[in-house]
Amino acid sequence: MEDYIAALADFGKTMGLPELAPDEKGYCCLQFDKKNTVHLQYQPEEDQLIIFIQLDFVDSDHQLSVYQMLLEGNFFNADNNGATLSVQPGNDAVFLTQMIVKERLTFAFEKTLENFMNAVDYWSAKIDEANNLDEGKDVDEGEDEMEGVSENESFFKA
């Protein structure tokens, strides 16, 4: 947990939050752009950090197309920078989750978090678009913003 605490402290200094730290159970949440609340939970048994966010809910009228889109996005993590998309049973909440092993905490925490937030922006827009489609239309198959962006690259939008 020491690596996680140090990585979070370094990130906090960069963001102007010098006292940023997890609680005694390893939990911390961060809000970006006053709308995206990202949860971080250290798992001592696995010596890893899990990052997760609830993106949206699946509209019941568009379940099939949204589920298909999410499954395709998980295919070799092509559209999510190494994170995983899932749907919470019972309420159709869509989550994006990423595991960070201890070794990545010491040298790539900030970059991993940046890539995660890029995937959050991308998938939030895709889900919103899919939930608001007229029946019988497909989600826009236009240019894929994530195409060509590897897990080690970034394209923060200003």
Give the location of each predicted region.
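Charge-rich, low-complexity N-terminal segments
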Residues: 1-38
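Conserved short hydrophobic interaction patches
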Residues: 11-14, 69-77, 112-126
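Hydrophobic residues embedded in beta-strands of well-ordered beta-sheets
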Residues: 28, 47-49, 92-94
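A generic beta-sheet turn/junction motif
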Residues: 33, 44-46, 89
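A short acidic-to-branched-hydrophobic micro-motif
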Residues: 39-42, 46-57
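Short, internal acidic amphipathic alpha-helical interface segments
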Residues: 54-90
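Well-ordered alpha/beta subsegment
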Residues: 83-114, 121-140
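Short, highly charged C-terminal tails/helix-capping segments
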Residues: 128-158
